[in-house]
């Protein structure tokens, strides 16, 4: 307890000795948000709910684009166990329940189409996410602000999801999936950055787990919603997820607070202090007393402006973002690929997806423990090695017909992939300053999506060699996770706002380590 209070003591004394000197915004934020209040929690939940609806759009095709079950009508030429329905007359068989609109496959008559056409909606969704990641990353961090970007992203995603109800063929549906992918490509980025910039260093590991938990709850709720509407049209599932998402985006617009760090960086000190007052009403008096000691706007405007291109021009930034993207590519393959490949283990699809979602919940308890007890690098490295080994062993157990053990190992691999993503998301926030943090986080999620885009093709390998895709995902997670050894350690460090501050602190840390 004494150690946690020690850093505040000299700062307080220094402020008392010279109350006329400028005070850094980082010190003001850290002190005013040193306690975690109920208003902070409500703001985190409000923003974090965007990830709930985002996760539903990511995994919704598991149910809407599934191959429906069918039965024979003419048993003289049809056998459910051996017959290929593409080689017998349409009158000899029918979909279970006699309902053609249960799935995209049945409604658009894709049962005998190529695998490319059947997987086109999922593929265009990921392509849209990749294109959106590139295009939206070009928007400067200082243009609209964290809150406005999150609102536009969530609202566009929900509006397009509702429009899918009007799609009449696979091409229109695939185009709308592309638009959804484009719109939601940076939803997680905007939400994570907005939350992390409104919290102190002390509470960051725990607070940033809230939106991730809500992401998983979205995944879990999707399984429940899909089960409840399993006898209705697949389009109903889009309405059940998109309409609440649209309502939530309106709540974001009216009730979510902007990032105080971003406001300060834009020279809007008055607005930044007002946000801090609303987040932490108990420290209103302290904030009013120190607001006049912040650097004025004209001083802030003298600092250099940065954009995403600087992540590739500045040597240390390029090195970090490259390493992060390599690690996230491997984690993305496992995180998105394992739920797709689980059908090769021959378990109930509703049960398997629900269990995969439930397995994620403990990760939000484990992740803060790892962040508080161990270094960032070692946590990422060991987690990736364990997760990769689980994936490879899952493949081996499947070859020997040990279905239950293989499924348990699949859950273990998915568990580690989720922890890895949690760790890297917080790690990246600490690796880059406020002026490029949005852009850097976009690159992280871009690598995650590119890894996910490879999954449908890799998962299809399991149809020829049972569960081979698990071995591929396992080797990717372990092998690419080794690059964590090349990243600098950031445990216990506060966030920087400019590139200059980041460089000065990194240099100071190098000097202290060499002494």
From Swiss-Prot:
CDD domains: MFS_OCT_plant (cd17378). It comes from the Eukaryota. The chain crosses the membrane at residues 44-64, 125-145, 150-172, 178-195, 209-229, 236-256, 321-341, 351-371, 380-400, 412-432, 442-462, 468-488. It is found in: Vacuole membrane. Belongs to the major facilitator (TC 2.A.1) superfamily. Organic cation transporter (TC 2.A.1.19) family. Residues 1-43, 146-149, 196-208, 257-320, 372-379, 433-441, 489-515 are cytoplasmic. Induction: During drought, cold and salt stress treatments. PROSITE patterns: MFS. The gene is OCT5. It comes from Arabidopsis thaliana. This is Organic cation/carnitine transporter 5. The lineage of its organism: Eukaryota, Viridiplantae, Streptophyta, Embryophyta, Tracheophyta.
């Amino acid at each position: 307890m004494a150690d946690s209070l020690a850093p505040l003591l000299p700062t307080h004394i220094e402020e008392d000795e010279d109350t006329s000197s400028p005070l850094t915004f980082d010190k003001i934020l850290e002190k005013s948000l040193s306690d975690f209040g109920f208003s902070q929690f409500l703001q985190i939940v409000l923003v974090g709910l965007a990830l709930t609806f985002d996760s539903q759009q990511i995994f919704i095709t598991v149910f809407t684009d599934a191959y429906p079950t069918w039965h024979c009508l003419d048993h003289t030429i049809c056998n459910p166990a051996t017959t290929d329905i593409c080689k017998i007359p349409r009158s000899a068989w029918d979909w279970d329940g006699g309902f053609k609109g249960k799935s995209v496959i049945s409604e658009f008559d894709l049962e005998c189409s190529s695998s490319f056409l059947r997987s086109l909606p999922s593929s265009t969704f990921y392509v849209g996410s990749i294109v959106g990641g590139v295009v939206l990353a070009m928007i400067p961090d200082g243009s609209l602000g964290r809150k406005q970007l999150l609102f536009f992203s969530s609202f566009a995603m929900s509006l397009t999801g509702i429009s899918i109800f009007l799609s009449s063929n696979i091409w229109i549906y695939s185009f709308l999936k592309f638009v959804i992918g484009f719109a939601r490509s940076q939803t997680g980025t905007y939400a994570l950055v907005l939350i992390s910039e409104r919290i102190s260093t002390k509470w960051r590991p725990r607070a940033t787990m809230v939106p991730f938990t809500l992401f998983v709850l979205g995944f879990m709720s999707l399984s429940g919603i899909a089960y409840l509407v399993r006898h209705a049209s697949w389009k109903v599932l889009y309405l059940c997820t998109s309409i609440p998402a649209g309502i939530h985006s309106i709540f974001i617009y009216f009730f979510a607070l902007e990032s105080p760090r971003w406001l300060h960086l834009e020279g809007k000190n008055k607005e930044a202090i007002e946000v801090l007052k609303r987040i932490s009403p108990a420290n209103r008096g302290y904030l009013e007393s120190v607001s006049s000691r912040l650097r004025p706007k004209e001083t802030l405007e003298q600092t250099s402006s940065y954009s995403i291109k600087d992540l590739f021009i500045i040597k240390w930034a390029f090195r970090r973002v490259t390493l992060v993207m390599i690690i996230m590519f491997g984690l993305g393959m496992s995180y998105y690929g394992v739920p797709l490949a689980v059908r090769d283990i021959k378990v109930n699809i509703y049960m398997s997806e629900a269990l995969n979602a439930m397995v994620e919940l403990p990760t939000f308890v484990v992740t803060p423990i790892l962040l508080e007890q161990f270094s960032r690098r070692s946590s990422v490295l060991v987690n990736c090695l364990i997760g990769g080994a689980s994936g490879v062993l899952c493949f081996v157990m499947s070859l020997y017909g040990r279905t239950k053990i293989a499924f348990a190992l699949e859950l273990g691999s998915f568990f580690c992939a989720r922890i890895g993503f949690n760790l890297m998301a917080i790690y990246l926030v600490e690796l880059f300053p406020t002026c490029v943090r949005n852009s850097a986080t976009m690159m992280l999620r871009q690598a995650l999506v590119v890894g996910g885009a490879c999954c449908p093709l890799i998962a299809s390998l399991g149809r020829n060699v049972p569960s081979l895709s698990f071995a591929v995902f396992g080797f990717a997670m372990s092998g690419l996770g080794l690059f964590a050894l090349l990243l600098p350690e950031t445990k216990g460090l506060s966030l920087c706002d400019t590139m200059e501050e980041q460089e000065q602190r990194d240099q100071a840390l190098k000097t202290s380590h060499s002494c």
